[in-house]
């Protein structure tokens, strides 16, 4: 069995040191578990904060933020998908997820392709799109990486599956306007839609789907809806963080992926 841990929390806006301490706090709480993969949310070190994105991006190595996460990976003997940080490269900013192995080594990174420029979102005004899909061979499985709004583009996930992904990981900061967040009926609908999208991606591709979201109010206009989940290839929700600042954990059996793909050879159908 393979142990997966999601860390869902509310980053303190612009305070990298505080947020990194939160990550380590949650890891310490779970050090007695079998940690094969730990996943952090999108923008885990800064929160959603244009000022931080522009004024204090990390360099192409991930800077001190990813250096710290690399130390955590080695200390706790786990692979980590380090949510996302804002990376500056060749005078452009990217929303980048670094993948780190148990030795504390960066083994790859994925730059978000589909930026959120809708319903008041302005990500594309600040950040540039990536142009490469990424799968990574870890010591227990091949994983594919996508970020947040990528989920609205099913073909991306189909391609990751064709590339051999058995697990797809989605760091995210999935948000709604505060008027939606504060209305129980509207929030329930938004969360149900979010859950349905993620379960569909798992089932369409017969993979384990691991998504890690922020939670709670981000600013006076927006809130993150939580519901970080670990989902099986048959859409079973193995763990759900709801709307709390917490961790969720599940043991997964990768033989399930092989079994269902042997029955339904979906990558051979186009």
Region spans (language model):
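Short, conserved active-site loops that position catalytic residues or coordinate cofactors/metal ions
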Residues: 6-8, 33-57, 171-173
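Short beta->alpha transition motifs characteristic of CBS
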Residues: 46, 98, 110-116, 229, ...
């Amino acid at each position: 069995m393979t142990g997966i841990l999601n860390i869902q929390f509310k980053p303190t806006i612009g305070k990298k040191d505080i947020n990194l301490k939160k990550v380590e706090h949650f890891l310490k709480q779970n050090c007695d578990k079998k940690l094969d993969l730990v996943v952090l949310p999108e923008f885990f070190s800064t929160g959603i904060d244009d000022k931080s994105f522009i004024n204090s991006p990390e360099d192409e190595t991930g800077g001190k933020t990813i250096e710290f996460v690399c130390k955590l990976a080695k200390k706790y003997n786990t692979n980590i998908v380090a949510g996302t940080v804002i990376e500056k490269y060749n005078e452009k900013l990217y929303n980048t997820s670094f993948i780190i192995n148990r030795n504390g080594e960066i083994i790859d990174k994925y730059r978000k392709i589909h930026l959120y420029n809708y319903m008041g979102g302005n990500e594309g005004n600040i950040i540039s799109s990536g142009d490469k899909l990424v799968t990574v061979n870890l010591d227990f499985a091949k994983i594919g990486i996508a970020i947040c709004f990528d989920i609205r583009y099913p073909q991306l996930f189909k391609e990751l599956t064709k590339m051999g992904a058995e697990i797809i990981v989605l760091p995210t900061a999935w948000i709604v306007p505060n008027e939606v967040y504060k209305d129980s009926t509207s929030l329930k609908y938004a969360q149900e839609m979010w859950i349905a999208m993620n379960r569909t991606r798992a089932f369409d591709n017969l993979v384990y789907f691991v998504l890690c979201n922020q939670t709670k109010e981000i600013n006076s206009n927006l809130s993150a809806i939580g519901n970080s989940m670990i989902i099986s290839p048959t859409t079973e929700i193995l763990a759900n963080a709801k709307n709390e600042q917490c961790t969720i954990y599940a043991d997964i059996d990768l033989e399930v992926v092989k079994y269902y793909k042997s029955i339904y050879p979906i990558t051979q159908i186009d």
